């Protein structure tokens, strides 16, 4: 094996070999239990980020673990067409490169442009997924707009429509005036903002007066531009100030519309003036009030968010109405909505109807992609009746057919599902699944899989002109069918029979409503088992937290703190990293701040660490459901782990290759260390399997690290040296056999988390073991063998380790060179301790670097010594001739003085009010941590001074 571990040399060729050999495919053995994971499809034109790397590491670990247990495994891969996101990217691209809009192209040519863009950049993310070592079946790769999935989408739409679970209606939606499309509640980002509350007088009609004799009501609003669309004023029916006015009218300022005063509990007596203007076409709460009181709906805005030239007036059913005039005052027509706000406030003020303006803290809805203020807008949209679909989906989680890990996410799921609103599924975009609905010239709607089917089913001749609905479906509509459409539905395929329901879904909690809930609803409605019982899409939902930067900040391009997982695998120079973080920024003014932070954090760029180190780090940080702060030091630590495993394997191979390791017979004697490591290994297997079975990848990674680094490398390899240098033939055979057996088992154990290094080493080790199989990934996963857990060997070895560590600690405390042989005295020994010393004298002499071991009588004071107490014995190391008392005390005094200087410096900092007020919380915490560390170090040095003074 190469002297040093270079992941760059082994990872890509190895992955290509795996893929070429077809190792990632299901084994096709239907007698075996199947295990299937559906990858959450990333955006087809996107690139891999840390969230992907994190979730995919977890999924690949599970898939490799189950594959090694002989299960028929499928990790289904695919990408998402990502409607709004992809359309925006291509629109920006043609604007920047050609100065054109999508309208210059026209629908068909623009869609062709997107397909072209997908062909050019769609492979980036799948190439990156290969670099992570993902063992997905690439031959089954799907795309949410491939022919099969498009057919599944049409099938679902048509069936739901025929079951009256999809309908078209004029309702209020979140409208993004920049993207000119409806967006879902989940795509709205509510931001806190400082605004104003305008108090406007609405004159009472017909000579009516308030209880205190006023001839007007004062209405408070944060959106005065919507006054033009008011169709009522609500007061609380219990409000003594206004209840006698219910049923009377006010005259709406500026448009002189006569609108009713209604009694509704939506009006809060304690809030504002107690009078609320009702604009059903431009506010979600007002829409509900309007429905309750049959108030007409007046739309005053265009799809761009400008004031219309004439309003649209509808009744509560959404049908056109002439109950009110559609006239809008000429001075407000065509004004942009926020310009209209100023103009309307000025006009109201000029009429003497502006009572006051108060500062007001408010929550403003923004579109998370378009980045502009969202308008509630009355539009024709397609909806899914969600309550019908939600009922069985709630029951599936209640009765345990689907389990959330961690369990607390069930509450989040229930709270949303039990109060579910109808789902608006239409989007005013061009890229996506076009809605399979057609209209004739009379406005009749026909739904079918194709236009031909529509004509046939409805007996429409060629003379009837039909035009297809212009809208496309919400991206999440096709994603909701992901678990079954990818397996060939609506056909009853073998894949669907073998792999559905799938086993585990790995997802971030941020898309629990967008995706998880909708998959459960859609799957249970369309997929039934042979008894007609609805099938769940998956049995377990494993929720992950978000990956944040080292300060706990969300990673984002605008903060310049994004870390590309492949930069940690391959490394990146500082200039390249700076260009990546500051090039093409939406907010170029942030570039300098980002540059400074990056230079401080990565002065030499990022070193290459290899895929396995990245995967190990991600697994180790995967504590269920909690957000994760990324830690470069952990990554370095796991790269060191890979180096340690490599070097340990080289040691094993150097001592076993072309040697008699007992695989072809011959007597074998196992040393205490051999019996101990076999026991340790089996206990590790048991705990590790339990952790993986319970989705505790962090615990599994910790168990693997502890056994490999501490037990196998640091202890066992050292404990083999006495046998290797002076053992009999049968002892040598036993130790070599154990070395190879444990290493081979360890490689299989570690393979799901760190596949590349384990496969590479295993290819050498398998030869010694006489294994002829081609790849580690199809080898059986290690199983716990209770017969190999030798309790006596465990107890004896732990005692020897205690003794060796005690001697090493005395060396360190007394500053004695590691290679200097020492005399060891033992006093007050139990019979067990004496037996252990006598049975394992050569181990102790070798590993503790001792020249002699003497057991003293219990009452023997012995010479002046440093002592340590261990189980059943007191250890003494005589100090005569080992240290110069005066020199050692002088050295310790110097150390104490140095530490006291550091303590004074930090205490000074922390007592400086200016520093404490300005410094971030994390910096202060770090300084306090340092202070505690120095205080502890000082206490230890003072303890040592006391011991040496007493010598």
From Swiss-Prot:
Keywords: Aminoacyl-tRNA synthetase, ATP-binding, Coiled coil, Cytoplasm, Ligase, Nucleotide-binding, Protein biosynthesis. A motif ('KMSKS' region) lies at residues 554-558. One of its GO terms (biological process) is valyl-tRNA aminoacylation. PROSITE patterns: AA_TRNA_LIGASE_I. It catalyses: tRNA(Val) + L-valine + ATP = L-valyl-tRNA(Val) + AMP + diphosphate. A motif ('HIGH' region) lies at residues 42-52. ATP binds at residue 557. One of its GO terms (molecular function) is valine-tRNA ligase activity. It is found in: Cytoplasm. GO terms for cellular component: cytosol. Residues 880-944 form a coiled coil. Its EC number is 6.1.1.9. Belongs to the class-I aminoacyl-tRNA synthetase family. ValS type 1 subfamily. Monomer. ValRS has two distinct active sites: one for aminoacylation and one for editing. The misactivated threonine is translocated from the active site to the editing site. The C-terminal coiled-coil domain is crucial for aminoacylation activity. Catalyzes the attachment of valine to tRNA(Val). As ValRS can inadvertently accommodate and process structurally similar amino acids such as threonine, to avoid such errors, it has a 'posttransfer' editing activity that hydrolyzes mischarged Thr-tRNA(Val) in a tRNA-dependent manner. This is Valine--tRNA ligase. It comes from Salmonella typhi. The lineage of its organism: Bacteria, Pseudomonadati, Pseudomonadota, Gammaproteobacteria, Enterobacterales.
């Amino acid at each position: 094996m190469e002297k040093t571990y270079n992941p760059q040399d082994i990872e890509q060729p190895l992955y290509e070999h795996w893929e070429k050999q077809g190792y990632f495919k299901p084994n096709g053995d239907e007698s075996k239990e199947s295990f299937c994971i559906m990858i959450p499809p990333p955006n087809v034109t996107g690139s891999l980020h840390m969230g992907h790397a994190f979730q995919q590491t977890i999924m690949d670990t599970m898939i490799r673990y189950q594959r090694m247990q002989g299960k028929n495994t499928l990790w289904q891969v695919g990408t998402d067409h990502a409607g709004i996101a992809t359309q925006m990217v291509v629109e920006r691209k043609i604007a920047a490169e050609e100065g054109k809009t999508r309208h210059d192209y026209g629908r068909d040519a623009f869609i062709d442009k997107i397909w072209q863009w997908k062909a050019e950049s769609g492979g980036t993310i799948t190439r990156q997924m290969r670099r992570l070592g993902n063992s997905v079946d690439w031959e089954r790769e799907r795309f949410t707009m491939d022919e099969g999935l498009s057919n599944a989408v049409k099938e679902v739409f048509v069936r739901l429509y025929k079951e009256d679970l999809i309908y078209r209606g004029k309702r209020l939606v979140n409208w993004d005036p920049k993207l000119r499309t409806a967006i879902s509640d989940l795509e709205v980002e509510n931001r806190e903002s400082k605004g104003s509350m305008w108090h406007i007088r609405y004159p009472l009609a017909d000579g009516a007066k308030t209880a205190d004799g006023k001839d007007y009501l004062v209405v408070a609003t944060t959106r005065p531009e919507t006054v033009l669309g008011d169709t009522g004023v609500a007061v609380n029916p219990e409000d003594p100030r206004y209840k006698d006015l219910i049923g009377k009218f006010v005259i709406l300022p500026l448009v002189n519309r006569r609108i009713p005063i209604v009694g509704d509990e939506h009006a809060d007596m304690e809030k504002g003036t107690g009078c609320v203007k009702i604009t059903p076409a431009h506010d979600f709460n007002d829409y509900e009030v309007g429905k309750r009181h049959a108030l007409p709906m007046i739309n005053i805005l265009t799809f761009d968010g400008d004031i219309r030239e004439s309003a649209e007036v509808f009744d509560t059913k959404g049908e056109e109405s002439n109950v009110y005039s559609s006239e809008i005052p000429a001075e407000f027509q065509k004004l942009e909505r926020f310009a209209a706000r100023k103009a309307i406030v000025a006009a109201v003020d000029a009429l003497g109807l502006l009572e006051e303006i108060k500062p007001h803290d408010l929550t403003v809805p923004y579109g998370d992609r378009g980045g502009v203020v969202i308008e509630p807008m009355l539009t024709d949209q397609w909806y899914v009746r969600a309550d019908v679909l939600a009922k069985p989906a709630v029951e599936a989680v209640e009765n345990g057919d689907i389990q959330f890990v961690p369990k607390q996410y069930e509450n989040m799921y229930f709270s949303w599902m039990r109060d579910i609103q109808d789902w608006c599924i239409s989007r005013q975009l061009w890229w996506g699944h076009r809605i399979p609905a057609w209209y004739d010239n009379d406005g009749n709607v026909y739904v079918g899989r194709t236009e031909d089917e529509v004509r046939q089913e409805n007996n429409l001749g060629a003379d009837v002109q039909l035009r297809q609905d212009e809208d496309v479906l919400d991206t999440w509509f096709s994603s909701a069918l992901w678990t079954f459409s990818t397996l060939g539905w609506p056909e009853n395929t073998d894949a669907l029979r073998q792999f559905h329901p799938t086993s585990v879904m790995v997802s971030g909690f941020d898309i629990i409503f967008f995706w998880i809930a909708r998959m459960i609803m859609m799957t249970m409605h369309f997929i039934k088992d042979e008894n007609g019982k609805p099938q769940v899409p998956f049995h377990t939902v494993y929720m992950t937290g978000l990956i944040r930067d080292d300060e706990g900040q969300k990673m984002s391009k605008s903060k310049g703190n994004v870390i590309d997982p492949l930069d940690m695998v391959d490394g990146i120079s500082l200039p390249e990293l700076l260009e990546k973080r500051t090039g093409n920024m939406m907010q170029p003014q942030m570039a300098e701040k980002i540059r400074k932070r990056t230079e401080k954090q990565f002065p030499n760029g990022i070193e290459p660490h290899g895929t396995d180190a990245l995967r190990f780090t991600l697994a180790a940080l995967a504590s269920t459901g909690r957000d994760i702060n990324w830690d470069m030091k952990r990554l370095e630590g796991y790269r060191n782990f890979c180096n340690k495993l490599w070097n340990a394997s080289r040691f094993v191979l150097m001592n076993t290759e072309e040697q008699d390791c007992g695989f072809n017979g011959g007597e074998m004697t196992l040393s205490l260390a051999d019996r101990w490591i076999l026991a340790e290994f089996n206990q590790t297997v048991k705990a590790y399997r339990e952790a993986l079975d319970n989705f505790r990848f962090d615990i599994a990674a910790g168990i693997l690290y502890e056994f490999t680094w501490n037990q196998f490398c640091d202890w066992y390899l050292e404990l083999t040296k006495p046998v290797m240098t002076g053992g009999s033939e049968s002892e040598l055979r036993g130790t070599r056999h154990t070395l190879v057996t444990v290493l081979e088992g360890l490689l299989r154990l570690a393979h799901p988390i760190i596949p590349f290094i384990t496969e590479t080493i295993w290819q050498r080790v398998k030869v010694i073991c006489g294994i002829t199989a081609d790849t580690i990934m199809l080898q059986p996963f290690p199983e716990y063998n209770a017969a190999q857990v030798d309790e006596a060997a465990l107890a004896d070895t732990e005692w020897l380790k205690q003794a060796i560590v005690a001697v090493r600690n005395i060396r360190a405390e007394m500053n004695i060179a590691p290679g200097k042989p020492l005399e060891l005295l033992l006093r007050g020994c139990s019979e067990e301790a004496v037996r252990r010393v006598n049975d394992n004298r050569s181990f102790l002499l070798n590993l503790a670097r001792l020249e002699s071991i003497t057991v003293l009588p219990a009452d023997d004071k012995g010479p002046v010594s440093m002592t340590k107490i261990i189980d059943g014995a007191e250890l003494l190391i005589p100090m005569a001739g080992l240290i110069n008392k005066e020199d050692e005390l002088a050295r310790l005094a110097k150390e104490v003085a140095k530490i006291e200087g550091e303590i004074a410096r930090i205490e000074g900092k922390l007592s400086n009010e200016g520093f404490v007020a300005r410094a971030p919380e994390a910096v202060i915490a770090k300084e306090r941590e340092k202070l505690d560390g120095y205080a502890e170090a000082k206490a230890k040095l003072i303890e040592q001074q006391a011991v040496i003074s007493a010598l």
